[in-house]
């Protein structure tokens, strides 16, 4: 399965829930597939899951989604133990695993040599940690993630990617600063966070 196929299924089940993407072209693909205003795009390596763990704990009535790559997840592994400790039932983490750092020349990541993110998540105390190697399994995981209490940790094994095969994606029409402002304004408009001037 491809990254785009995974994101298309994700978009069908996400609804209007807040979501965050990791760095690089994954966010740009999601923007093209199905842009929603409550999306924080292109967060730095290692930070997406940590940031939305905090959001999940602050907004327990909102299901929140993280989409990041294997490289970004590997850069922020310590967050898994914190998820296992606090177990926010509304947090869904999706790791799109292509086993490489594509934008740096497809340098293999640790998952290419056997590092098992699902086993790490389970070892950290995340019971609902699953691997999806095909679209039907990934879709079943998505269905469960919106119907059951989490936290969920889903690793989607996708086809090998490189810059030649995926092509150069279009640049985002805004930078990370504007993405943050838009994201916060959306949460504010929904009454989920106080107006910025009252903080």
Q: In which residue ranges do the predicted regions lie?
A:
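Thiamine diphosphate
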Residues: 28-98
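Generic beta-sheet signal
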Residues: 17-19, 62-66, 91, 148-156
């Amino acid at each position: 399965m491809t990254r785009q196929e995974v994101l298309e299924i994700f978009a069908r089940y996400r609804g209007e829930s807040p979501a965050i993407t990791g760095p690089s072209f994954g966010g740009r693909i999601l923007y093209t597939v199905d842009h929603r205003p409550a999306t924080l795009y292109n967060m730095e390596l290692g930070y997406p899951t940590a940031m939305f763990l905090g959001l999940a704990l602050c907004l327990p009535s909102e299901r929140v989604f993280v989409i990041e790559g294997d490289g970004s997840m590997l850069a922020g592994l310590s967050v898994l133990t914190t998820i296992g400790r606090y177990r926010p039932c509304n947090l869904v983490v999706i790791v799109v695993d292509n086993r490489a750092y594509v934008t740096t020349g497809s340098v293999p990541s640790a998952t290419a040599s056997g590092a098992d993110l699902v086993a790490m998540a389970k070892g950290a105390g995340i019971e609902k940690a699953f691997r999806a190697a095909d679209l039907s399994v990934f879709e079943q995981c998505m269905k469960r993630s919106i119907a059951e209490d989490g936290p969920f940790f889903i690793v989607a094994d996708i086809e090998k990617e490189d810059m030649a095969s995926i092509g150069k994606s279009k640049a985002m029409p805004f930078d990370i600063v504007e993405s943050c402002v838009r994201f916060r304004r959306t949460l504010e408009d929904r009454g989920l966070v106080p107006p910025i001037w009252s903080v």
